[in-house]
Amino acid sequence: MTKIGGILVCLVIVGLDVAAAILGIQAEVAQNQVKHMRLWLFECREPSQDAFRLGLGAAAILVMAHVLLNLVGGCLCICSQDEFQRSSSTRQISMACLVLTWIVFAVGFGSIVIGTMSNSKSRSSCGFTHHHFLSIGGILCFLHALFCVAYYVSATAAKDEAK
């Protein structure tokens, strides 16, 4: 029963991350369909309400996936480098995956938020181009799914190993 629960948790997290990735990429497509004028590095364009909504949805779903992972993955506390070096390889892999998950989440979430905010109604302006933030955030959602599964599997194995 535990294996079925673990598989279900992984599928839900991957499903949420894939949904966030698809929404982020669709937001990029919607953003590119808006009229804009470009002169070298500067660009003037109208914000896309569709891109704003899709980006907001992608950010919310990515946060849900990350929170779910941290709730079900548990906490494997390693407080010092000595403790890290003395811990088992499974626990070290788990901690590395957790750190990578947080890094990918921070960069992906930040990219999606930057892309989403550039499509806010109040942001109809000219300036430096900010292309591909939404699609980069979407791609990082796929990477987030990969590290989430790796963390969950290794954290579960480390907990079983400790028993």
From Swiss-Prot:
It comes from the Eukaryota. Expressed in vascular cells, mostly in hypocotyls, and, to a lower extent, in seedlings, roots, flowers, siliques, developing leaves and inflorescences, but barely in mature leaves and seeds. High levels in leaf primordia. Residues 1-27 form the signal peptide. One of its GO terms (cellular component) is endoplasmic reticulum membrane. The keyword Metal-binding does not apply. Keywords: Developmental protein, Endoplasmic reticulum, Membrane, Signal, Transmembrane, Transmembrane helix. GO terms for biological process: cotyledon development; cotyledon vascular tissue pattern formation; determination of bilateral symmetry; intracellular auxin homeostasis; leaf development; leaf vascular tissue pattern formation; phloem or xylem histogenesis. It is found in: Endoplasmic reticulum membrane. Required, together with OPS, for embryo provasculature development and cotyledon vascular complexity and connectivity. Necessary, partially redundantly with DEAL2 and DEAL3, to ensure bilateral symmetry development and early leaf margin patterning, probably via the regulation of auxin and CUC2 distribution. Regulates cell proliferation but not cell expansion. Interacts with OPS. This is Protein VASCULATURE COMPLEXITY AND CONNECTIVITY. The gene is VCC.
